[in-house]
Amino acid sequence: MKTTNLSKAVTAICVVLIGAGLINAQDWPQWRGPNRDGKVSGFTAPAKWPKELTQKWKTTVGSGDATPALVGDKLYVFTREGSEEVTRCLKAVDGKEVWQDKYAAQAVTGAAARHPGPRSSPAVAEGKVVTLGVGGVLSCLDAGSGKLVWRKDPFPKVVPQFFTAMSPIIVDGTAIAHLGGKGNGAIIAYELSTGNEKWRWADEGPEYASPVLMTVGDTKQIVTLTEKNIVGVGAADGKLLWQLPFAPEKRAYNAATPIVEGQTVIYTGAGRGARAVKVEKKGDGFVTKELWSNPELAPQFNTPVLKDGFLFGLTNRSNLYCINAETGQTAWTDATSQGRGGFAAIVDAGPVIMALPSSSELIVYKPDGKAYGEITRYKAAESPIYAHPVISGKRIFVKDENSVALLMLE
């Protein structure tokens, strides 16, 4: 039987996709991935891990620790150049710029001046890109053209001590962000298409944690750490549904993203440990029930991943660890320090866990609840990395101090 021209074309396309690492590749449209849980789908571990990563391209984009967002064949990067914050749309295949938007940004002062660029990851949905600048400016751009849709600054020059780090979330046509600073802030929801304010919960200002979405019964909730508590507010109206005290002390901060699994919320903070609660519907309201508490391990500047009943993360002393997520008991802690001060991104890549601490070494290890088992490690950049890696198929996009690069596992 003859091979048709169509089948030849399909075969050629498949070969190109496989070569580019795009088969089973997923989008990474927001902070910590599609579901804000650090999980990668479609990643296949190589039969033999290469000795090093292959750099396909690298381009200078400006300072900042914001994780890029990947949607289709476009990479959205948010950085600072001089006195301006810049959003760029790049072609994922070669790093070439498609469009950019920029505006004058607030000066970053004090200890935070060592990291003057944005830390908040863009959120991409419904044809829009939403960014949050270091000074609290929330912007919405058209994802295709870069045209400004709306820009808001509800708390001018009011920011947390080290400026903003929370990444906005888009839910049902609404952009939601925790804005302002200590003693003066609010979780605010804006209509994505118009920028009109839909609701605000103004009881507490933000620290550095990013919100996640949780559904209990038929109620969608925005769950986040605030200055002093962990809270759940209605995604549709901003009504406070439940809260638990979780105030940091001394040099501790609420910076880790809560982890949601069904009706369970796991949250962590330096000096207070890791905790798990169950959120339940009761009458017209909601109640919480503590499931466990682990005072030993409390990551602050990274968020663990939940995999097969275990939590994998990095301690404040930069030691990789594992907690039994059913009991809260420590399963293991590796003695080797990885980088600086507990800064890291932890990724569930299916057959492996990947950790990228600020040392810029990508550590690949087994998702084993019994013991730490390192598989390999790679140098991902020459300068420190504080952004999350974006993993899609065989592709790994990394943002270092001033550049973004595409690395390949091949």
Q: What is each stretch, according to the model?
A:
Residues 11-23:
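Hydrophobic helical h-region of N-terminal Sec-dependent signal peptides
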Residues 1-13:
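Bacterial N-terminal signal peptides that target proteins for export
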Residues 21-410:
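Noncatalytic, solvent-exposed loop/strand surfaces
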